[in-house]
Every structure is written in C-alpha cells, then in structure tokens.
Amino acid sequence: MRQAATERLGIGYKNLRKAAPNIIYASATGYRRNSPKDGRPAYDDVIQGESGLVDLIDKTNGEARFVPMPISDKFCGHTLASAIGMALFSREKTGKGQEIHVPMLETMLAFNLTTHLWEGTKGPTNDLGYPRALSPYRIPYKTKDGMVCVLAHTDEQWHRLLRAIGRSDLIEDARFTKLSERAQNIATLQSYLAEELAKFTTEEAFRKLDEADLPNGPVAKLDELMIDPYLQETNFFQKIDDPHENIVFTTAPPVDFSGTPATVRSAAPALGQHSEEILLSAGISKNIVNKIINKGR
C-alpha cells in the first residue's frame, strides 16, 4: 500500500507509533520514498522490466519475456521478512522499534546486479552482464533420450567433469586451465560439454557424473513433481483442511528448525477472517472493534 493511502486511512507509521512507541512497522512499495517515482503504482511485471530482468532474458534467448512467476513480489516479500527479523532482533537488544520500507525496484536491482554488474564494478559501462550466466550454452544438456543439469565451479571439479565425459585432453588446454580463462571462453567449453553429453543416455550421464562426485540432476517436469519419489519420501507436499475447499495440497515449510519445527497450521484465511483478531492484538478495544465490523457490514 502506498504511503499516501496509509496516511489517509490513519494507519501510517507516525500515527501507530503514538499508540505503540516500539512498533516495528514494515511496508513495501514500488519505489524508494521521497524519490522522483515515489507514489507511482507498480506490479511485478513492471518491476521485472525496470530492473533489467526482462532484458537479461532477451539477452539469452532473443525474446523479451517475463520470468514465469511473480519473482519480484516473492523476493521483495522475502527481503521484507528478513528485514523484520533483523528489526525484531534489534528491538530485543535496544528496546526500540523502527520503520522498515522495502522498495521493489531497488530490491530487484540489487538482486539482479549482484550477479550482472560485472564490468560495472569499475564504473559506468555498457559491458554489464555475467558472461557465464548469459552463455547460450548455459542450458540443460541433451542426452540421447533426455536432458541433464550439471555444473562445475572449481578447477578440480572441471577436471573431474572433463574426465567423466572423455575429454581429459581439455584439462591442459590454455583456454580452460584457470577460472579467469574459463570465464572468457565459457561458451566454447560448454559447447564441448553439450557435444559429449549428447553421446550418453540420461542414466549413463547420471552414473558418470555421480562417480565423479559432481553436482547433477534431472530436468523435472512441473506436473511430475507431486508424484516425485524423493518429495514423497520427505513429505514435501502436505494436505490441510480448508473450510471452503475441504482438502487442499500445499508445500511444507522448506526450512528445518531443530528447536522450533515449522508447520503449516491452517489454510489461507478467507476475506476478513482474522480482522477482529488483528485489531484486538493491535490494542484496539473490543467495543471499537465491534463498531468497525458493524459499520463494514
């Protein structure tokens, strides 16, 4: 919600801080406060475009497209949650609350340019974009009957990978001996991998890569994930009761806590389901809450 709206509704930081001086007040909008774009509306697709993410996809496949998920919304939400955790820790130490604001554009710029600032670390330049990540060969490798994903980073891993695919001769090739040389010739190196892996079946490729202790895996189809044996073994998909849908499937929390295990406690709430609970927890009297609810009916 944009700042003008929260102020108009009387739920801005300054107002709420009067009632709860140590409040941690978190918000996210499209752009940084007090900037030329402050107050402009923004959604995920807009931020994908402005942050250079669409251009990155264009650079890899020659077509400007959005990432097929609301990645800006998701990452900004994670950033906001992380910031809230840090503010809570600070309050435990100092007793003081604070206001947190996460601008979507700046958050996604930081997310993208951590990888792709590249030569821009030396100053303004047209040479942005990490070559290895933008290589046309940075794709799953085709086998005789499918595809595999494999990645090597260290010199030793590259040596093991080249031996595994039968190209030990490339280990001493001056273009690939060190990280800096590989970075400059990554497309050529990846083209060799593609050529050799295409000679194996998928199972043969997995076996060779596993024997070399290299990170590798399949290309999973989205509609096969819910019956994937590994995910079934780890109970990743969970059934929960939903008063509106009877039973719904959802994903389990991906983080494991040894002392405070995470659980899915309930389905997503219906519209207004928790309004009374939230208002009461904010310190608003039961009488006023009832008036608010009755007025809204």
Where are these regions (language model features)?
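Flexible, small-/acidic-enriched active-site or ligand-binding loops
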Residues: 177, 245-291
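Short linear loop/turn motifs
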Residues: 172-182, 219-227, 288-297
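Active-site-adjacent "lid/gating" segments in soluble enzymes
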Residues: 5-148, 152-153
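Helix N-cap/coil-helix junction residues
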Residues: 11, 167-170, 231, 284-285
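Aromatic-enriched alpha-helical interface/lid elements that frame and gate functional surfaces
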Residues: 136-212, 216
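A glycine-rich dinucleotide-binding beta-alpha-beta segment and adjacent secondary-structure elements
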Residues: 211-265
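Conserved beta-strand edge residues that scaffold enzyme active sites
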Residues: 4, 30-32, 223-224, 293
